[in-house]
């Protein structure tokens, strides 16, 4: 996979998400970069499926990542709170987890996702990225200046050649 660069911590987290079969999508600035607009971002945004089963998988992955004690998260139920946003670290290496995004449901975004493989020290791991249609819908619904600017520069042709996975 080309175009996205992740810190070692983020790579380790992606590996653990994969190992635990967490359903998530990379959204936000990193998705914008993937879709062709090279710009700065201070975090990596993960949009996870807000189901009980997936929150348990995510909780287990985070427990492993944090060596048994997740900051501010006591149980999988914390991950299911409506509109939950969990932030770890500081910019430029902050990691955000969210169970909803503006203008797009997880089901809708998952159906149009782009599936990539990220090479991490010990092998290749799947990485799901929000597809261009859902990303554009999300950015339009957010309506902030930076989101509207993103819409001017992302390139649909970048994702059209990538393999889209149907659920």
Enumerate the language-model features and the residues they cover:
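Compositionally biased terminal segments of proteins
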Residues: 1-167
């Amino acid at each position: 996979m080309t175009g996205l660069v992740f810190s070692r911590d983020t790579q380790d987290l992606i590996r653990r998400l994969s190992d635990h079969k967490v359903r998530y999508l990379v959204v936000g600035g990193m998705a914008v970069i993937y879709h062709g607009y090279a710009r700065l971002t201070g975090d990596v945004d993960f949009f996870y499926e807000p189901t009980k089963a997936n929150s348990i998988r995510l909780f287990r992955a985070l427990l492993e990542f944090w060596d048994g004690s997740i900051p501010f998260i006591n149980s999988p139920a914390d991950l299911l709170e409506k509109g939950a946003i969990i932030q770890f670290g500081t910019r430029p290496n902050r990691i955000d987890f969210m169970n909803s995004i503006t203008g797009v449901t997880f089901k809708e975004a998952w159906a149009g996702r782009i599936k990539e493989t990220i090479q991490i020290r010990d092998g290749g791991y799947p990485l799901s990225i929000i597809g261009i249609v859902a990303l554009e819908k999300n950015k339009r619904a957010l309506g902030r200046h930076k989101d509207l600017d993103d819409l001017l520069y992302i390139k649909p042709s970048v994702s059209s050649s990538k393999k889209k996975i149907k659920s």
